[in-house]
Amino acid sequence: MAIKLEDKKAIVAEVNEAAKVALSAVVADARGVTVGAMTGLRKEAREAGVYVRVVRNTLLKRAVEGTEFSILNDAFKGPTLIAFSNEHPGAAARLFKEFAKGQDKFEIKAAAFDGKFLAANQIDVLATLPTRDEAIAQLMSVIQGATSKLARTLAALRDQKEAAAA
């Protein structure tokens, strides 16, 4: 089905706006995935703050031109499903990775984060990034552990001095 020029321009503009504000992008091939499964993926994506769209490769190349995601151009082959993470860099990768577990025909092609190209086998790096809240919790745990160790050391030192004085 042919798309009118105005519609193509609108698609390019929409995807370009999504790319400009995105933290990361993941590209996948969704051939053979049922409509129901894709609808479920789109619903989960909305809830996770991820922009998901199937776009023709030529339009996608134009849309990401001038953004940090233009490094994905070589991955735009065959039917392309692109996801842009808006709130957390690992959200799209995590979403696609979970979705791929239940779909044999769903194939993650590549990703881009912070101006770097990530091949399909490197997606785990992006998917396992902690969320902001998880990172803060980990940091607080480290700080709390260090302060409690310091307190125990000072208490042991005090006890040692008291024992020596007595």
Swiss-Prot record:
Role this protein plays: Forms part of the ribosomal stalk, playing a central role in the interaction of the ribosome with GTP-bound translation factors.
The keyword Kinase belongs to this UniProt entry's keyword annotation: no
Coiled-coil region: none
Record-linked SUPFAM superfamilies: Ribosomal protein L10-like
Keywords: Ribonucleoprotein, Ribosomal protein, RNA-binding, rRNA-binding
Subunit note: Part of the ribosomal stalk of the 50S ribosomal subunit. The N-terminus interacts with L11 and the large rRNA to form the base of the stalk. The C-terminus forms an elongated spine to which L12 dimers bind in a sequential fashion forming a multimeric L10(L12)X complex.
GO terms for MF: large ribosomal subunit rRNA binding; structural constituent of ribosome
Record's keyword annotation contains Ribonucleoprotein: yes
Protein name: Large ribosomal subunit protein uL10
GO biological process: translation
CDD domains assigned: Ribosomal_L10
GO cellular component, one term: large ribosomal subunit
PANTHER family from the UniProt entry: 39S RIBOSOMAL PROTEIN L10, MITOCHONDRIAL
Family to which the UniProt record says this protein belongs: Belongs to the universal ribosomal protein uL10 family.
Superkingdom, natural source: Bacteria
InterPro entries, alphabetized: Ribosomal_uL10 (IPR001790), Ribosomal_uL10-like_sf (IPR043141), Ribosomal_uL10_bac (IPR022973), Ribosomal_uL10_bac_type (IPR047865), Ribosomal_uL10_CS_bac (IPR002363)
